[in-house]
């Protein structure tokens, strides 16, 4: 095999920090999310009842501020701690670390389990793609939300291209620019078709590459990751976009990801011996809290 190509998107992820992953910090994030969810629910209740009482009570609990300061509505000590915790994970401009005593004090404002692994979510992004091809073929791989594999065969006859997808994703879907043939190694080759759904991924897989026109295969993957039961992917994604817009992830010379799915999958492949996925799960719940807080308190905070 003369040529080897891998997905550049996964080759050099900027690793998320490993701050705030202890039990007390996980408890703080879970409490922040719980109180933020009550804050936004109380805001709607106040609108519907034309009474400030529900919001005042929820805000006082969330913000840890005396009610006489409610007219400011910036979120108080909880908002400051939550914002700084999120900022610290991925930014070279992170503020001072939130003191552990403050984390513990705010975490005691409600009783939650802090269990970050009692449910799961499925994340969709680019899979590991490793392609081995013989001489007189070329292969390139680009993309972040999907991997576009472009192959060209300039030889005298059809070539077998070997694909491997690793063992992290559970399912990979391949879509061709034209119908193509694919089978597991040492298995009969089926008739050509546009789409293949691969599961399990214990390859390798062989693609038949005809001579002539380029073949483009787009690969997307679904990866199941354990998350807390309260984890809401829509709110996490909204919080991720809001935090990006607010500058909480500002950093120089690093990858910027278009979605939280891309972000967590890239961290999944930062194979440096540190479990950064568990950190991303805590960060995701913190972003969910941030999203609800910002919608309940629509003022620019950073």
UniProtKB/Swiss-Prot annotation:
GO terms for cellular component: viral capsid. It is found in: Virion. Keywords: Capsid protein, Virion. InterPro entries: Seadorna_VP8 (IPR026380). Self assembles to form an icosahedral capsid with a T=13 symmetry, which consists of 230 trimers, with channels at each of its five-fold vertices. This is Intermediate capsid protein VP8. It comes from Banna virus. The gene is Segment-8.
